[in-house]
A protein has these predicted regions:
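A short, contiguous structural element within a folded domain that forms the immediate neighborhood
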Residues: 220-253
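Short, compositionally biased
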Residues: 1-117, 171-172, 176-183, 203-206, ...
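Hydrophobic alpha-helical segments, especially N-terminal targeting/anchoring helices
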Residues: 46, 254-257
Length: 339
């Protein structure tokens, strides 16, 4: 798709092929710009609503602006089945930042893992080409002989998992992904702090889930054979699902509940006693390399209780499993990243 030549700047509107991922966007174009829309977003283009993207096609990494603000981090004592490690609730003031609209996908991971180190770049640990367990050989797909009663779930090796979130990624692997992305783009990509993650997940909500007091299997991917509060039972999918399949929260982020546990920067602490109030990662200066790191969000494998906005877990930084993935944040460091 090529922008029609015109005199001076103008605004162009594009309808994207995947409206779940982006509802549509407007961008300022020069008269000689060529814009290629293939799936999600356009390389290096900034949107006036606080959205920007790297790459093209299925590997597009869409980053959403998370506005500055403050919130009560942790769960209140009256929250159903809350744990002491989710408190004490404390007020946190955060600066704005960009966060990935979706968890990192298998296609995005493969793209970055395949990059060849260029002069001036310094890669760290090796990245497997695709560590995910749920590839086309293992993802169940629906087959039908023509009537709904004859539908069944089968494994036939034909599933396309490009848009499934990448899993079996350790904290070290997630950080190396951010390192390569930062060096290649000149921007500061990293994992979110625990405070950034919960603030973005809640998106102004104060309930156990950003959707309310409970959650249902049409809103997230978790083990819905169990319930939280008054929530109904439902389907247990037993695997990952494509990113963006479920509704976004109020700030446009998808898959913050369930899907995959997501790594955060912070070292693990048993409570929030002494936690930072500025949204920064809570790190132990003298910690060993194997000190546990934070995990948030729950996964496809878990009961809904684990998927609450305030629930916390941890893992050794070398830990990788079929229920662990990540998403990235980008920190504003100059005028080009201001929304």
């Amino acid at each position: 798709m090529t922008a029609t030549p015109a005199t001076g700047p103008r605004t162009a509107t594009f309808l994207l092929r995947q409206p779940r991922q982006v509802q549509g966007f407007r961008e300022q174009l020069r008269s000689d710009d060529e814009v290629f829309v293939e799936g999600v977003f356009v390389e290096g283009v900034f949107d006036q609503g606080g959205v920007f993207a790297e790459e093209q096609k299925k590997t597009a990494l869409t980053m959403l602006w998370i506005p500055p603000g403050r919130f009560w981090m942790g769960s209140p004592e009256e929250e159903l089945d809350r744990q002491d490690l989710e408190g004490p609730q404390h007020l946190v003031q955060l600066q704005g930042f960009f966060m990935g609209q979706m968890p990192i996908t298998q296609a995005q991971w493969r793209k970055v893992a395949a990059w060849v180190e260029q002069p001036g770049e310094q890669w760290g640990c090796e990245l497997k080409s695709n560590p995910a367990w749920f590839d086309g050989e293992k993802v169940k797909i629906w087959k039908s002989s023509g009537s709904a009663s004859d539908e069944s779930v089968v494994l036939d090796g034909s599933a396309n998992t490009d848009l499934h979130p990448v899993e079996q990624v350790s904290w070290h692997g997630a950080m190396e992904f951010c390192n390569r992305l930062s060096q290649r783009t000149g921007r500061h990509y990293t994992l979110p702090s625990e405070a950034q993650w919960e603030y973005a997940c809640r998106a102004g909500s104060t309930t156990p889930f950003h959707v309310g007091a409970t959650i249902t299997p049409d809103l997230a991917n978790y083990d819905a054979t169990t319930t939280y509060g008054d929530g109904p039972k439902g389907e247990y999918r037993e695997q990952t699902t494509p990113v963006g399949l479920f509704p976004a929260n109020a700030w446009g982020l998808h898959d913050m509940h369930g899907s995959l546990w997501e790594w955060c920067l912070d070292h693990w602490h048993d409570s929030y006693e002494g936690a930072p109030s500025d949204g920064s990662a809570w790190l132990m200066p003298s910690a060993s390399e194997e000190e546990p790191r934070l995990l948030r969000g729950g996964s496809w494998l878990d009961d809904p209780w684990y998927c609450r906005s305030a629930f916390r877990d941890r893992g050794r930084p070398g830990f990788a499993n079929v229920y662990v993935g990540f998403r990235v944040v980008c920190l504003p460091q100059g005028p080009s990243l201001n929304p």
